[in-house]
Regions:
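Extracellular/periplasmic carbohydrate-active domains that bind, remodel
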Residues: 1-340
Length: 340
């Protein structure tokens, strides 16, 4: 992280050379928290209906006090709900009790130059939940579950956290997805519309084998009723994908709350490079019951390369499709309709 000097408007300061046991640090509007390099803050940080809040600095927030060594706890680590103008910059968030950085139903959020490292299952890195106008950049994320995740769902039974997700840009991040989960994930809980998201110029250095529903470098898992469309992935380098490269599915699973399923369409992948390791499989699958059919459609793959070799066909990509229409590889439609 780049060195950050103490802001003039700092309201809460944690000084270097000290360990602070804060329990739950609750912020209010216009708070600026400065964590000096060499300071360790032990606890969680929450903000509810706040405007203009910042956590900056080069110190550490440690969440290990909130969970047993090998299990999670029923709380988030850094959690902002219904907040406006949020800045998280420079500090390291390590070993939280569950999801690590969670902006929920927030507007105008910047997450910049952070290090996020989790160790326990459900230790998601960043969960952008029902938020709009969000930028995530220059971060290193090593997570034992989804690394960067988009959701729209009730949190702790609060229906107010179900809202559209739009205007999200994720760029210039380094991602290590450890078992389980996915590296860049939309889902599973997508209960409102998800649209106009951009993921670009990121490095996925590891996406480890999961052996369950996830395990993809880039995934969209629609288990609910929100419409997912106009999602762009550009200039992403994958150093290791042990299970899957792309995984796009509409499905029923244990996370489902809405039985009527939302569509997935107008998804764009451009210049995605697998640099080494085994050649991973990719999957696109829609949803079908005796009374409902939802097909994934209009998915575009351009300039996908494995170890420098361009994939010209769906066979080159090791792409499997089911209940999918209008899938394109380098501009050529590979299927109108496929049934198994």
């Amino acid at each position: 992280s780049h060195r950050i000097e103490k802001p003039a408007d700092t309201t809460i300061c944690f000084e270097k050379g000290k360990v602070y046991n804060v329990g739950v640090l609750t912020l209010k509007s216009n708070d600026t928290v400065y964590i000096e390099e060499g300071a360790v803050v032990s606890g969680c940080v929450y903000a509810d209906h706040c405007d203009n809040i910042s956590i900056v600095g080069n110190g550490i927030i440690n969440g290990a006090c909130w969970h047993l060594p090998d299990s999670n706890a029923d709380r988030f680590f850094i959690y902002a709900k219904w907040c406006n103008n949020v800045l998280l910059k420079g500090f390291t968030a390590v070993d939280g009790p569950s999801w690590h950085v969670v902006p929920a139903a927030c507007d105008h959020v910047v997450i910049d130059d952070m290090n996020i490292m989790s160790r326990i299952v459900t230790g998601d890195g960043i969960d952008i939940t029902s938020s709009q106008d969000v930028e995530v950049k220059n971060c290193f994320i090593r997570s034992t579950d989804d690394s960067i995740c988009i959701k729209s769902q009730r949190l702790f039974e609060d229906p107010s956290t179900v809202r559209d997700v739009t205007k999200v840009r994720v760029h210039n991040n380094v991602i290590w997805n450890a078992e389980p989960g996915n590296a860049i994930e939309l889902g599973y809980a997508l209960q409102s519309e998800i649209h106009d998201l951009v993921f670009e110029d990121c490095d996925i250095i590891h996406c480890q084998y999961e052996g369950n529903m996830g395990g993809a470098a880039i995934s969209i898992h629609q288990a609910d009723g929100g419409h997912v469309h106009d999602i762009h992935y550009k200039n992403i380098r994958v150093e290791q994908a042990e299970q899957k490269l792309f995984d796009i599915k509409v499905l029923l699973c244990r996370y489902t709350e809405q039985l009527a399923k939302g569509e997935i369409n107008d998804i764009y992948f451009d210049n995605i490079q697998v640099l080494n390791g085994d050649i991973p499989v990719s999957m696109i699958r829609g949803y079908q019951t005796p009374t409902e059919e939802v097909r994934v459609h209009d998915v575009h793959f351009d300039n996908i390369t494995f170890m420098g070799n361009k994939c010209e066909t769906w066979q080159d990509m090791r792409l499997v499709t089911e209940l999918a229409n209008d899938i394109y590889v380098n501009g050529a439609r590979i299927c109108r309709q496929m049934k198994f």
